[in-house]
Design a protein with these regions (language model features):
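Glycine/proline-rich loop-helix segments at beta-alpha junctions forming the active-site rim
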Residues: 39, 43-44, 55-57, 149
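Acidic/histidine-rich, metal-coordinating catalytic segments
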Residues: 49-63
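Hydrophobic/aromatic beta-strand patches that form the interior of the parallel beta-sheet core
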Residues: 12-14, 52, 98
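Catalytic metal-binding/acid-base residues of hydrolase active sites
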Residues: 17, 58-60, 102-103
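Metal-dependent phosphoester-hydrolase catalytic domains
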Residues: 63-191
Length: 191
């Protein structure tokens, strides 16, 4: 875990254990990790304060976060205990900033390297940006940057998840016509 305060917002970056196989010692360690994270959050943070908790949480919280729930049934990332741990973490006062802007299925942050899964969009949404209410009300858009996942060599089996938190009183459209235009401007290229 890495934590810093940026422009008055506490940013906490985490990486959850994979869990490997449901029922294994690695899976038990993953659930213990979630319990510890929930305890830390309750002890060290305030749900009324600006907070972003994000990273690879290795959980697809809902069936729409998986390309084929039947194919993944019984595996890690989608099991009942993992989803319950994720729900307990959020129940304290964290909201899924990405899902707020994108309720539709078929949008993922992770694809296996094998069998062309990325190009077939056989993926999972296991990376998350969970935010408290003060941040959620300022989050103007969210996007999965699939472009970063393309090319050779493939940099990662994950794609970056991005949210934009605007200052209060500043309009979203500062000359950009879309979120894609804003991403392109930040990269210094045309949309």
């Amino acid at each position: 875990m890495v934590s810093a305060v940026c422009a008055g917002v506490r940013i906490v970056c985490v990486y959850a254990p994979n869990g490997r196989v449901v029922g294994s010692p690695f899976f038990a360690a993953k659930l213990t990790w979630f319990e510890r994270l929930s305890r830390w959050r309750a002890d060290a943070a305030d749900p009324r304060a600006p907070l972003v908790l994000g990273g690879d949480l290795n959980v697809a919280p809902e069936d729409i976060d998986v390309w084929d729930p039947a194919a993944c049934h019984g595996g890690t990332h989608v099991s009942g205990p993992e989803r319950e741990a994720f729900t307990r973490l959020c129940r304290w006062g964290l909201a899924d900033a990405y899902r707020r802007h994108h309720p539709e299925p078929g949008r993922y942050t992770w694809w296996d390297y094998r069998a062309g899964c990325f190009h077939k969009n056989f993926g999972m949404r296991i990376d998350h940006l969970l935010v408290t209410a003060p941040v959620l009300e300022r989050t103007v858009w969210a996007e999965i940057d699939r472009e970063a996942r393309k090319g050779k060599p493939v940099p990662s089996d994950h794609a970056p998840l991005v949210i934009d938190i605007d200052e209060r009183g500043h309009a979203f459209d500062a000359g950009w016509k879309s979120a894609e235009g804003r991403i392109a401007a930040r990269r210094g290229r045309p949309a």
